[in-house]
UniProtKB/Swiss-Prot annotation:
Pfam families: tRNA-synt_2 (PF00152), tRNA_anti-codon (PF01336). Binds 3 Mg(2+) ions per subunit. Belongs to the class-II aminoacyl-tRNA synthetase family. Homodimer. The gene is lysS. It is found in: Cytoplasm. GO terms for molecular function: ATP binding; lysine-tRNA ligase activity; magnesium ion binding; tRNA binding. SUPFAM superfamilies: Class II aaRS and biotin synthetases (SSF55681), Nucleic acid-binding proteins (SSF50249). This is Lysine--tRNA ligase. It comes from Neisseria meningitidis serogroup B (strain ATCC BAA-335 / MC58).
Length: 503
């Protein structure tokens, strides 16, 4: 807004004084009229006006007198003699308003001059361009639609306090265009994933959020109580077992995008409630699921970024090339070539090496569990470009189908990008007797103190006994996918209202 001379700012008052002053203004408005009218009808968005008229020259645009009605939050306001300029912001962007006593009455102008930054206004008028070429609405009528009682963050400093950003996301969205764009992209990513699944002839379904038995993943659940039934219920840690029941029922391709809950720690990549997609396909296997995961992620990147070659934290990530595939042991040796096969199959050596890398020993320290723990300590964080880690041990994969050719391993994968897990999938175990034995082994682990071990789910076994077709399944963390595709460094930046300690 180069025409303006001096921006209008709040008096040099503290926040409480500013709020008190604004409340007084609101009281005065209430004495005269409805302070919160709801009859202004907007017909234009800022971005649409810029797209349609932004390239038209002043000489061509001004004589047309194109009428518009716009509405939004006042972000800038400046007076220049008998005229005033303001910038309002709607969901699509910003547009400038111009008021003078030729377009509106002096009473309206005086009223406008008492309004504050953050107020929500509706204006009508005609489009023109300033001498500096800025598309502007020459206002013929303007109304205050909602009074802002609290001051916005400083225009130049923005909302810099991270905790305030997360606690008061509404202020963050007002003040920070980058945050708004991140959450717009999040919505586009989810829509891209949904469209892709529908294009693959999958049926979107909804399964329970409260489970009588927690299952579908190894994690600690949140527990609640149903008063009428007088039973404990568990917020779901994964929808897997219900989705596979649907495959038993003949819904051969199903997916669900929804929340899951895990009563675990919080970090830059963990929030107690999170969004994921899980999908299952009959007459499929983990090879098909790996290709599906690869295609979903690549397609989402192209949709929101226009390319599958992106940058994360200043470093390139190649989502375009076929994703690499390694076993757990291959990944360990890739980054630690001095390790020998003998060492990697020695339980005592593995335990010492795990501790050396700062990892905790697994609750059930079989060779497979120990190898996985070492992988997490010495290799996982180095997997920058997308890499499928395949063929997980049976003991850490209680729902995955055992390999026909590799003793003690399963047809399971996890996908890692920028050093963190993004997806998990496998050929589903569809032998009910084998599944029952694995559930029993999980119960033994739980009795030994492993809070994350699974319960025995008798109804799921009953469903399997009707016959689960050969099936592939996969889960992808939506929050982590959004982090990757928006170059966000913490999960809190991509969840609108992340879990916080109470104030």
């Amino acid at each position: 807004m180069s025409e303006q001379n001096h921006p209008q700012t709040e008096p040099q008052l503290d926040e409480n004084q500013i709020i008190a002053l604004r409340r007084e203004k609101l009281h005065n408005i209430r004495q005269q009229r409805n302070a919160y009218p709801n009859d202004f009808k907007r017909d234009s968005f800022a971005a649409d006006l810029h797209a349609q008229y932004g390239e038209i020259g002043k000489e061509e645009l001004d004589p047309q007198g194109i009428p518009v009605k716009v509405a939004g939050r006042m972000m800038l306001k400046r007076q220049m003699g008998k005229a005033s300029f303001a910038t309002i912001q709607d969901v699509s962007g910003q547009i400038q308003l111009y008021l003078n006593n030729k377009g509106v009455s002096q009473e309206v102008l005086d009223d406008f001059n008492h309004w504050d930054l953050g107020d929500i206004v509706g204006a009508e008028g005609t489009l023109f361009k300033t001498n500096h070429g800025e598309l502007t609405v020459r206002v013929s009528g303007i109304r205050l639609l909602s009074k802002s009682l609290r001051p916005l963050p400083d225009k130049h400093k923005g909302l810099s306090d991270q905790e305030t950003k997360y606690r008061q996301r509404y202020v963050d969205l007002i003040a920070n265009e980058e945050s708004r764009n991140t959450f717009i992209k999040r919505s586009q990513i989810i829509q891209s994933v949904r469209n892709f699944m529908v294009g693959e002839h999958y049926l979107e379904v909804e399964t329970p959020m409260m489970h009588p038995i927690p299952g579908g993943a190894t994690a600690k659940p949140f527990v609640t109580h149903h008063n009428a039934l007088d039973i404990p219920l568990y917020l779901r840690i994964a929808p897997e077992l219900y989705l596979k029941r649907l495959v038993v029922g003949g819904l051969e391709r199903v997916f669900e995008i929804n929340r899951s809950f895990r009563n675990e720690g919080m970090s830059v990549r963990h929030n107690p409630e999170f969004t994921m997609i899980e999908f299952y396909e009959a007459f499929s296997d983990y090879e098909r699921m790996m290709q599906m995961a690869e295609d979903i992620i690549r397609n989402a990147s192209r949709t929101v970024n226009g390319t599958a070659n992106i940058t994360y934290n200043g470093k390139e990530v190649d989502l375009e090339s076929p994703f690499e595939r390694l076993t757990i042991l291959e990944a360990i040796k890739k980054y630690n070539p001095h390790y020998t096969d003998e060492q990697l199959n020695d339980a005592e050596w593995l335990k010492k090496e795990i501790v050396k890398h700062g990892e905790s020993l697994p609750p059930s320290p079989g060779i497979g569990s120990l190898q996985l723990a070492l992988f997490e300590g010495c290799a996982e964080g180095k997997l920058w470009n997308p890499t499928f880690i395949v063929d997980y041990p049976v003991e850490v994969s209680p729902l995955a189908r055992a390999s026909d050719t590799k003793q003690g391993l399963t047809e399971r994968f996890e996908l890692f990008v920028v050093g963190r897990e993004l997806a998990n999938g496998y050929s589903e175990l569809n032998d009910p007797e084998d599944q029952a034995e694995r559930f029993k082994a999980q119960v033994v682990q739980k009795d030994a103190g492993d809070d994350e071990a699974m319960h025995y789910d008798a109804d799921y076994i009953r469903a399997m006994e009707f016959g689960l077709p050969p099936t592939g399944g996969c889960g992808i963390g939506i929050d982590r996918l959004v982090m990757l595709l928006t170059d966000s460094q913490t999960i809190r930046d991509v969840i609108l209202f992340p879990q916080m300690r109470p104030e």
